[in-house]
Amino acid sequence: MFKSGFITIVGRPNVGKSTLTNLLMGEKLSIVSNKPQTTRNNIQTILTGEDYQMIFVDTPGIHKPKHKLGEYMVNSATDSIKDVDLVLFLSNPCEEVGRGDKFIIEQLKNQKAPVIFVLNKVDESSPEKVAKTLELFSKEYDFAEMIPISAMKAKNTDKLLELMVKYLPEGPKYYPDDMITDVQERFVVAEIVREKALKNLSQEVPHGIAVDVIQMKQDDNGKYNIEVDLICEKASHKGIIIGKNGQTLKKIGSTARYELERFLRAKVNIKIWVKVRKEWRDNTSLLKELGYKKLK
């Protein structure tokens, strides 16, 4: 019997949703950073096994929005819960169930798919705290299963995969065996550049940046020539992004080029231009130009 279905991964910001997706896929498709609210779009990735096909939706973390971009991210995440076959609800070991987790649980009550509670980052906590957290969440919702894992250490993730197959319905193969994502290359390129910016900039700047791929061409030798605009909200942020003697921007570019060459499996030449677009996160038309379509 072949099983297939759509699986959405939800949770508060920075609980490891993208890390888990990348681990299960064996490919780096979702942007990963230690800063919260890193994922901005629903990334759809496809994992095909001998008798199953899983289509993952990696969502932004659900949080209280502060601007139109934040509204887009929360709408995107809550919409993804609807009409799926299985939900993975990720959280971390904690002393109490937070408001963000309770908000997600309220959204889960409006859908019929089974929900697996995944307690991530157990390698960073004590067994006592892990047990306490599982007990706390078991009182909040009737989960189909509850499982502690470490996505970073690949601990217990094989068992999680078995549980996911168990709860998938019988269904067709929606995508070819060799297809691993439905997003375009340009989107992944933009996400890689944004990830490197996140890792090389101070806490104040990263969430005020966006990446727009202006050009992506492959020459006769197979080399990619890529030009991107790195968009920020303030002139002062532009100086921080460029850095002294351009060193910060050079580091973003060099680390992005290395990752892009691994992803594209070809040589890459990348040029990054820093542009100021004041309050772009509250500019609906600009947000849509940058690919954030689900604004209400």
Curated annotation (Swiss-Prot):
It is found in: Cytoplasm; Cell membrane. It comes from the Bacteria. Residues 149-151 are annotated as: G5. Residues 201-278 form the KH type-2 domain. GO terms for molecular function: GTP binding; GTPase activity; ribosomal small subunit binding; small ribosomal subunit rRNA binding. Keywords: Cell membrane, Cytoplasm, GTP-binding, Membrane, Nucleotide-binding, Ribosome biogenesis, RNA-binding, rRNA-binding. One of its GO terms (cellular component) is plasma membrane. Residues 120-123 are annotated as: G4. Coiled coil: none annotated. Belongs to the TRAFAC class TrmE-Era-EngA-EngB-Septin-like GTPase superfamily. Era GTPase family. Monomer. This is GTPase Era. The gene is era.
